[in-house]
Regions:
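Short, charged, low-complexity patches
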Residues: 166, 279-288
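Beta-lactam-recognizing serine transpeptidase/beta-lactamase-like catalytic domain environment
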Residues: 1-36, 41-275
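Short, gly/Ser/Thr-rich active-site loops of penicillin-recognizing serine hydrolases
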Residues: 195-202, 286-300
Length: 300
């Protein structure tokens, strides 16, 4: 092992110059924009502030015309009328542009982007997304977007999170608001199996929103999960939300997914980030393999 004891200088130089960055802990140190997985946070912010209700609907024509230039939905022909659950399922940009706009206008009726992003940042922090996770090794500090309430609402703007942050975020969502400080070590035992140290995750905070809010976002994620064939065909009742995020036009989009199962009694949460992974289908396939491993399907 060239990394054990005295390190081979030439080998270390080779690793440090490798474009695949093998010395980087991608799960804790690499950050990307989250893309549409942030729409769950936007939904919670909208529902809890009263911007949204169970029946609140926005019409998606394919573009958001309250600002110029008008940002587009990923479905250029539009989704038609969307509520919060169907908007999570369909990942409708225009619905969430409206939420971002209305959050920014909620103070005095005038559009104030900084006010809108500050609300989303508050919920991102409470959900454990925009704060450090507390693990035993170094992690990079996450950043909640502070520009363009409209773009921030769909997970663009200046959001920067690691896969670790997304894992903590979806765990909080699955737990209906219990946010944990994450740990890599559950417990330490001696050679005879006697407990030396209990290192179970501790509660950081709880997110005080209504049961209706949790029910709506869980339903939206359940509906979304049922549209992802490689997850739905497993039969594990997986709730999920995917995302693709563009940071540079010269590089492929990032692919993300947050998920938990089973959606009616969660016991496992999975987050996947594929930097420059092109499309969310790549992240979905990886998540499916994690679930198959967890449930032992890959051993059958």
């Amino acid at each position: 092992n060239k990394m054990s004891g005295s390190v081979d200088a030439d080998y270390y130089k080779q690793l440090s110059e490798d474009k695949s960055k093998p010395l980087l802990n991608w799960a804790t140190q690499s950050q990307t924009a989250p893309g549409s997985v942030f729409k769950v946070c936007t939904s919670i912010a909208g529902l809890d502030t009263g911007i949204l209700g169970p029946g609140t609907a926005f019409y998606c024509s394919g573009s958001f015309n309250k600002v110029t230039p008008s940002p587009r939905c990923w479905r250029l022909s539009g989704h038609g009328t969307e509520t919060v659950t169907t908007a999570i399922r369909d990942s409708c940009n225009v619905f969430f542009y409206n939420v971002g706009w209305n959050l920014a206008c909620s103070k005095d009726g005038n559009y104030n982007s900084t006010y809108g992003t500050s609300i989303m940042q508050k919920y991102a922090e409470e959900l454990g997304l925009a704060t450090t996770a507390g693990i035993e090794i170094d992690e990079k500090t996450p950043h909640a977007s502070n520009i363009s309430s409209i773009q921030s609402a769909i997970g663009q703007g200046t959001h920067q999170y690691s896969c670790l942050n997304l894992a903590r975020y979806v765990t909080t969502i699955a737990n209906t608001g219990t946010c944990y400080n994450l740990t890599l070590v559950d417990k330490i035992t001696d050679a005879e199996g006697n407990l030396v140290r209990d290192n179970s995750a501790e509660v950081s905070n709880t997110v005080d929103v209504s049961s209706t809010t949790w029910s709506l976002v869980h339903t939206g994620m359940q509906m979304a999960g049922e549209t992802y064939a490689k997850l739905n065909q497993l039969g594990y009742k997986i709730a999920a939300k995917t995302g693709t995020a563009q940071e540079r036009t010269t590089e492929p989009d990032h692919a993300t997914i947050i998920s938990f199962a089973p959606y009616d009694n969660p016991e496992v949460a999975v987050a996947v980030v594929m930097p420059n992974g092109y499309a969310s289908s790549s992240a979905i396939e990886t998540a499916a393999n994690v679930y198959k491993s967890y449930y032992g399907a890959d051993e059958a």
